[in-house]
Every structure is written in structure tokens, then in C-alpha cells.
């Protein structure tokens, strides 16, 4: 069967060789305002939108996620579990003509899998790249992006509740003592959240989201040059 590769609103016929994968986390507390699967929903939104704008294939989501041992705000897997899931997606992607894989990651802990990307390239003879788009956990940026895509319950009462760091220690990781002690960047972000709190800024959310989508689109363009 000869496929009409030039049909539709696509950048170039070569874009059919690019597959976009969303990576995040399904089981993490995000305060009172955001759902436990915030990271994967944001990653999926960005990845799918970029696929629509470019014509690249959206290959779906990775279900496992991982995290640094000292960050305790959810239920996670080993980095190897993500690696094995990616092996499955890449193997199936190759069957439909994908030669270049772009992972859109919106969960900081998943950075731990970067060490496996070269192994995947070598095993399957493909290109594998990852874009990391991360925010201070459940803080202003993530709440604002979540609101824009429709997953945040950001009324005044919920936001006030969200800023109760004793009840929701994961917000900004303010109350995650072990994480703050082991990671200077986390501690600095937590201090900022303690000082300024968490607020909703729709304009900020739109800008962050649009910039993230543009970043993925630009990477797809680079991959088909």
C-alpha cells in the first residue's frame, strides 16, 4: 500500500519518521489544586500539541516514572522500568516507520533515565532525544499551567488550602525535609515558595505552555533537517 505522505497539515514528509512520547508521573501528590497525575497530563498536552503542529507521530505515554530516593511525595518505579517501557515503544514505533524519537518529560525525577538513551539508540539503531520541562513542584508555574490546560481547581478557597504547607508538604517541597537536605536546588525553590506562596497567574501559565510547545516544535524541525 502506497501511503500519501504529503497529505495534511505537516511540515515535511520527513516528519513521519519522528515520534513524540510523553513522560511524566501518574502517582504524585500535588497539593489541593492539582491532580496526582499532573505531570503526565502536562507532558501529554505539550507532546500532542507539538505533534499536531508539526505532523510528527504522537506515540502516547510512558506509564512508569522514577524519582530520587530522597524525594517522597508519590509512588514511583525504578529507572529501569522506564527503560523497558521505552524499549517497547521504540520497537513498535520502528514498525510504523519512526526513526527518531523525542521524549517530552515533565517530571524532574525522570532525568535519571537519561543514562539509558544511548543504550536505546545503539540497540535499535534510532535517534532518541529528551526535552525536560520541569517546574517547582505544585508551585505557581505548575498551578498556572495546570489551570490553562484545565486540570487545576484554582478557586480562591482551593488556593488558600493549597498554601497550607503543613497539610500539603509536597507543595514547593517545603515540608520535604529529606529532599531539601539532599538537594540544594530543591531547598532554594522551597525557600522561594515559603516566602512568596503559590498563586495563580493565567498569563504566566499561557506563556510557559506556549514556550514549551514551541521548544518541542523547534526540536522536531531540527530532527528533520
UniProtKB/Swiss-Prot annotation:
Cofactors that this protein relies on: Fe(2+); Zn(2+)
Residue sites binding Fe cation 2 per the record: 30, 39
GO BP annotation list: F420-0 metabolic process; riboflavin biosynthetic process
GO molecular function, one term: ferrous iron binding
Disulphide bridges, residue numbers: none
E.C. number: 3.5.1.102
Catalytic activity: 2-amino-5-formylamino-6-(5-phospho-D-ribosylamino)pyrimidin-4(3H)-one + H2O = 2,5-diamino-6-(1-D-ribosylamino)pyrimidin-4(3H)-one 5'-phosphate + formate + H(+)
Description of how the protein assembles with itself and partners: Homodimer.
Similarity comment: Belongs to the creatininase superfamily. FAPy deformylase family.
Function: Catalyzes the hydrolysis of the formamide of 2-amino-5-formylamino-6-ribosylamino-4(3H)-pyrimidinone 5'-monophosphate (FAPy) to form 2,5-diamino-6-ribosylamino-4(3H)-pyrimidinone 5'-phosphate (APy).
Protein name stated in the entry: 2-amino-5-formylamino-6-ribosylaminopyrimidin-4(3H)-one 5'-monophosphate deformylase
Amino acid at each position: 500500500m502506497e501511503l500519501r505522505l504529503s497529505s495534511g497539515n505537516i511540515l515535511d514528509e520527513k516528519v513521519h519518521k519522528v515520534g513524540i512520547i510523553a513522560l511524566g508521573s501518574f502517582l504524585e501528590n500535588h497539593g489541593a489544586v492539582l491532580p496526582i497525575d499532573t505531570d503526565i497530563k502536562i507532558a501529554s498536552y505539550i507532546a500532542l500539541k507539538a505533534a499536531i503542529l508539526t505532523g510528527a507521530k504522537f506515540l502516547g505515554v510512558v506509564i512508569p516514572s522514577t524519582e530520587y530516593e530522597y524525594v517522597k511525595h508519590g509512588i514511583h518505579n525504578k529507572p529501569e522500568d522506564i527503560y523497558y517501557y521505552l524499549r517497547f515503544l521504540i520497537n513498535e514505533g520502528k514498525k510504523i516507520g519512526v526513526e527518531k524519537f523525542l521524549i517530552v518529560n515533565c517530571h524532574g525525577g525522570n532525568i535519571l533515565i537519561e543514562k539509558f538513551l544511548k543504550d536505546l539508540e545503539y540497540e535499535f539503531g534510532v535517534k532518541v532525544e529528551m526535552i525536560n520541562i520541569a517546574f517547582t513542584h505544585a508551585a505557581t508555574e505548575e498551578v498556572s499551567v495546570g489551570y490553562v490546560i484545565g486540570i487545576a481547581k484554582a478557586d480562591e478557597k482551593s488556593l488558600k488550602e493549597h498554601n497550607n504547607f503543613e497539610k500539603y508538604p509536597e507543595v514547593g517541597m517545603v515540608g520535604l525535609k529529606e529532599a531539601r537536605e539532599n538537594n540544594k536546588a530543591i531547598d532554594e525553590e522551597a525557600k522561594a515558595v515559603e516566602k512568596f506562596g503559590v498563586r495563580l497567574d493565567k498569563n504566566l501559565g499561557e506563556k510557559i505552555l506556549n514556550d514549551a510547545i514551541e521548544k518541542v516544535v523547534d526540536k522536531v524541525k531540527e530532527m528533520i533537517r
